[in-house]
């Protein structure tokens, strides 16, 4: 039997598809480079907001430390490319996996905290990460990393003559982040997360493993945020701790 919730989800999917199709043709009419840059960053932030929404919106764990995972993704891609010649695509996946693992490692102690204690812990962790990168000479310390530009190439994910490739990748990233969130909403994980958000004690009594649910949300959220950070590093062709500080 068709339910209001199912109809609402189908409607959301159709609306999202229409909006994505409209967004895809906008750059054909908007030629100003500055405006294109704004559109790219808007889509990137849209993807990041969906990533944050998984942990903080659905699971109810308010994190103010996601700048750490953003920075990990950016630095992983930049360091692997500049130091070892690893293509940004592999750095993007690697940065996401590293961030997911670190998110779970940090979540092990932090998810034993609740409320404002957890929020404060996420801020402290982000600040510690900022200080580590700020003083890590191999990663450029306070000077950051300048990514060498080696010509327009999808393989190296670098474009100088046009911002359109970045725009369409950012659009794809935003769509993927939204779709992952949309799909998870009606999965068992989505139900667990909402139960944990509403009342963790009641959820535990009904068989939901609260701690594992939080860890899963943290891993998925951190992975997507790190991919956004990797994209940002390639888009800017540099990475500096000052940008992470502004996020914190």
Predicted regions and their residues:
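Transmembrane alpha-helices and adjacent helix-loop boundaries
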Residues: 1-242, 246
């Amino acid at each position: 039997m068709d339910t209001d919730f199912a109809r609402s989800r189908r409607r959301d999917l159709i609306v999202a598809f229409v909006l994505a199709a409209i967004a895809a043709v906008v750059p054909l009419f908007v030629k100003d480079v500055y405006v294109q840059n704004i559109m790219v960053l808007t889509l990137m932030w849209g993807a990041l907001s969906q990533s944050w929404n998984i942990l903080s919106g659905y699971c109810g764990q308010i994190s103010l430390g996601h700048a750490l995972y953003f920075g990990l993704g950016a630095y992983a891609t930049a360091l692997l490319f500049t130091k070892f010649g690893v293509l940004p695509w592999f750095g993007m996946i690697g940065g996401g996996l590293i961030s997911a693992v670190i998110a779970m490692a940090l979540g092990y102690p932090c998810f034993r905290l609740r409320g404002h204690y957890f929020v404060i812990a996420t801020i402290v962790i982000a600040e510690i990460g900022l200080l580590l990168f700020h003083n890590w000479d191999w990663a450029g310390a306070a000077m950051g990393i300048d990514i060498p530009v080696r010509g327009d190439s999808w393989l190296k994910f670098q474009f100088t003559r046009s911002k359109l490739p970045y725009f369409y990748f950012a659009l794809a990233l935003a769509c993927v982040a939204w779709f992952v969130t949309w799909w998870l909403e009606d999965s068992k994980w989505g139900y667990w997360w909402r139960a944990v958000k509403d009342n963790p004690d009641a959820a535990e009594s009904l068989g939901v493993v609260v701690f594992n649910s939080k860890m899963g949300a943290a891993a998925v959220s951190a992975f997507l945020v790190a991919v956004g950070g990797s994209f940002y590093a390639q888009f800017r062709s540099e990475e500096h701790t000052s940008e992470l500080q502004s996020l914190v």
